């Protein structure tokens, strides 16, 4: 930076400017050499580990860099101030972090970049791994027996890519990149266009011409040898691959999911793997004990990644460089930034890149295809696809599709030009965030004096789900009845009926509760309506509050929303599905599993934070409480 201004000239309206601006990185960048060199003379940069959050450096910082606000411990969350600029680098769920920032009264800015190519590369690698069994054969690299010897059983089931049919669910940028890559491997491509967002935001899919659109999801499943999910998690896509839908899957097909775990019914997928209907499965992240049991670890046709499908060193460097540019503008020019990349901007950026790098011949082909679709061109059946496969493969190998590594320097320029068009749209959101700063400032000051060693949301999920372990873990771990001991009358209230006040104030993390129906006809329980099926919330009269099916653990997401974990469902959280059914389908704490509490414990109203029409009227009885010593004990 050619000119360094004094920190006294930097406008900070919330509090007086310090002598030298200070930037703190929390739980994201340990090696700050790049930031320190780029901001030399402008601001100091320091990494603060979570073990040193009580040193006071977070409160004195002008800007804070972090990966996700939701995964930050509450002790660190309470030390953040409304006047600070909070940069969220590459958040996995922007909506959750933005909601939490609004609750805490923080000024949060998301910094991200497109990761479509990384996702497409990972999916292609997973497909090749399942087809060629490379992850299994690599363990036997030193064997001298050859494929005619002991390795022959391991090679059974290996498939060639040429001639296989790839079915893509969704129309995201990563889906289109995957289509181009799979066509290069001489695979046929089908796709099912899942509408996402408002209708006016939906653009025509820009898949390669050789790809064919299917009218229904069931048709795609029946015709595909490999299925890959590339759709966002919405009300319409929750468990888009449920047990009923998976009945149409082609026997011997492979399933790949690098999106949300809630896109598919994990119990149904597990059963199909056991039955052999699905030949293999690859997931980017898995939830719950059903994916961590011994049988999964021993199955060679199951691949599980630690949520790393969208990562690359290039992506992380782009995000850090964007954050540095934002800090320069903030410190030197006093510019309050907005979110640098949104989902819509990523879509525009990748679409324009394809247009710039594709020849005019393909533009004409796209127009012809669009016209033929408007005239009512019918989609292909699986038989027609096989007949016309040879001609489709020739069209797929045209030079216009080889655009992955070209014109990489044009991409940032296009993003900067488009980001200016979004300024007015973000202006109203920025005003809301600034108003929230003033209203929530006093609450943040008071809460920051409380316990600084509170667990983060992720730690709460782990601690609560540890009480609901898998069957393998239960052999070496005591049951809740063995762990929870009787306490003295001075430590716990003798009966939950004595609680008077708002339910949100009386219920704490780790409490065990029972939910009675409003008409007192029975208890709400979690149960499987069919063998090996999903978990539902039902009302039964022939159960007691001591039955594990009727017991739920309270897990707070923030001060206003809670989650209900089921003992019987292995710690899964209560949520609402697209059929307006109360189900237990996920272990992760998202907005789908968040509920607001209204009224008292005797007349409590649970309202889903995602769908306000999903309401559960119950009477809550506290069965067990967490004492000051951290031990959960039953109430007599």
UniProtKB/Swiss-Prot annotation:
Keywords: Cell shape, Cytoplasm, Cytoskeleton, Developmental protein, Golgi apparatus, Microtubule, NAD, Stress response
Function: Involved in controlling the equilibrium between tubular and stacked structures in the Golgi complex. Required for cortical microtubules (MTs) arrangement that confers cell shape. Cooperatively with IPGA1, negatively regulates cortical microtubules (CMTs) organization in response to mechanical stress and modulates pavement cells morphogenesis leading to puzzle shape, probably in an AAA1/KTN1-dependent manner. Regulates the width of leaves by controlling the polar elongation of leaf cells. Involved in the regulation of trichome branching. Seems to not be able to regulate gene transcription.
Coiled coil location: none
Protein name: C-terminal binding protein AN
Domain comment as written in the entry: The C-terminal region (631-636) is indispenasble for homodimerization.
CDD domains: CtBP_dh (cd05299)
Organism: Arabidopsis thaliana
Subunit relationships: Homodimer. Interacts with KCBP and SUB (via intra-cellular domain); AN is not required for the correct subcellular localization and recycling of SUB. Binds to SOKs proteins polymers (e.g. SOK1, SOK2, SOK3 and SOK4). Interacts with IPGA1 on microtubule upon mechanical stress to regulate microtubule organization.
Effect of inactivating the gene: Dwarfism. Impaired cortical microtubules (MTs) arrangement leading to abnormal cell shapes (reduced complexity), and narrow but thick leaves, characterized by cells small in the leaf-width direction and large in the leaf-thickness direction; this phenotype is also slightly observed in floral organs. Reduced trichome branching. Twisted siliques and reduced seed productivity. Delayed flowering and senescence, but increased tolerance to drought and pathogen attack. No impact on polarized localization of SOKs proteins in root cells.
Cofactor: NAD(+)
Region forming the signal peptide: none
Protein's UniProt keywords contain Cytoplasm: yes
Keyword Transmembrane among UniProt keywords: no
Record annotation: effect of changing residue 170 to D: In doq-1; premature opening of flowers and twisted petals
């Amino acid at each position: 930076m050619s000119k360094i201004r004094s920190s006294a000239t930097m406008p900070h309206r919330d509090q007086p400017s310090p002598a030298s601006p200070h930037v703190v990185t929390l739980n994201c960048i340990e090696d700050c050499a790049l930031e320190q060199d780029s901001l030399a003379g402008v601001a100091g940069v320091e990494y603060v580990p979570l073990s040193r959050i009580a040193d006071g450096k977070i409160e004195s910082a002008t800007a804070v860099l972090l990966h996700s606000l939701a995964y930050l411990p509450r002790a660190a969350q309470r030390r953040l101030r409304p006047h600070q600029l909070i940069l969220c680098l590459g958040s996995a769920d922007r909506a959750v972090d933005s909601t939490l920032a609004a609750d805490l009264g923080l000024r949060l800015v998301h910094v991200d970049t497109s990761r479509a190519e990384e996702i497409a590369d990972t999916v292609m690698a997973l497909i090749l791994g399942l087809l060629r069994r490379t992850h299994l054969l690599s363990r036997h690299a030193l064997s001298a027996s050859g494929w005619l010897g002991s390795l022959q059983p391991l090679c059974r089931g290996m498939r060639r890519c040429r001639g296989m049919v790839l079915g893509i669910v969704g129309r995201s940028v990563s889906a289109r990149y995957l289509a181009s890559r799979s066509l290069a491997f001489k695979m046929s491509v089908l796709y099912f266009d899942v509408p996402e967002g408002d209708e006016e935001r939906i653009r025509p899919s820009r898949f390669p011409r050789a790809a064919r659109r299917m009218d229904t999801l069931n048709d795609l499943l029946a015709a595909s040898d490999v299925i890959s999910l590339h759709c966002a998690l919405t009300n319409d896509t929750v468990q888009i691959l449920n047990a009923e839908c998976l009945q149409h899957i082609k026997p011997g097909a492979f399933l790949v999911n690098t999106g949300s775990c809630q896109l598919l019914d994990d119990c149904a997928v597990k059963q199909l793997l056991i039955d052999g209907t699905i030949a293999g499965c690859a997931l980017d992240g898995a939830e719950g004990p059903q994916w961590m049991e011994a049988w999964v670890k021993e199955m060679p046709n199951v691949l599980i990644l630690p949520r790393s499908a969208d990562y690359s060193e290039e992506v992380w460097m782009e995000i850090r460089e964007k954050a540095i540019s934002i800090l320069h503008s903030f410190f030197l020019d006093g510019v309050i930034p907005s979110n640098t990349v949104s989902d819509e901007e990523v879509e525009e950026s990748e679409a324009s890149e394809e247009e710039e790098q594709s020849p005019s011949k393909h533009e004409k082909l796209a127009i012809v295809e669009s016209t033929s679709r408007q005239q009512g061109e019918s989609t292909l059946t699986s038989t027609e696809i096989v007949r016309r496969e040879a001609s489709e493969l020739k069209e797929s190998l045209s030079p216009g599709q080889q655009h992955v590594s070209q014109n990489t320097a044009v991409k940032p320029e296009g993003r900067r030009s488009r980001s200016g068009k979004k300024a007015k749209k973000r202006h109203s959101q920025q005003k809301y965030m600034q108003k929230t700063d003033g209203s929530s400032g006093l609450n943040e000051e008071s809460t920051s004096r409380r316990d600084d060693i509170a667990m983060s949301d992720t730690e709460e999920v782990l601690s609560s789900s540890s009480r609901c372990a898998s069957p393998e873990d239960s052999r070496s771990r005591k049951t809740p009845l063995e762990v929870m001991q009787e306490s003295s009358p001075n430590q716990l209230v003798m009966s939950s009926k004595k609680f008077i006040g708002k339910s949100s104030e009386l219920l704490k993390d780790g409490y065990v509760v029972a939910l009675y129906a409003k008409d007192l006809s029975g208890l709400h329980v979690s149960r499987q309506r069919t063998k090996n099926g999903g978990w539902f919330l039902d009302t039964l009269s022939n159960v007691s509050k001591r039955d594990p099916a009727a017991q739920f653990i309270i897990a707070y997401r923030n001060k206003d929303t809670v989650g209900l974990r089921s003992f019987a469902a292995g710690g899964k959280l209560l949520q609402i599905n697209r059929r307006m059914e109360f189900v237990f389908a996920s272990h992760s704490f998202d907005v789908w599993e968040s509920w607001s509490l209204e009224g008292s414990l005797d007349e409590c109203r649970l309202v889903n934070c995602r769908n306000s029409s999903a309401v559960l009227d119950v009477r809550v009885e506290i069965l067990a409480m967490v004492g000051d010593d951290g031990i959960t004990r039953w109430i007599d």
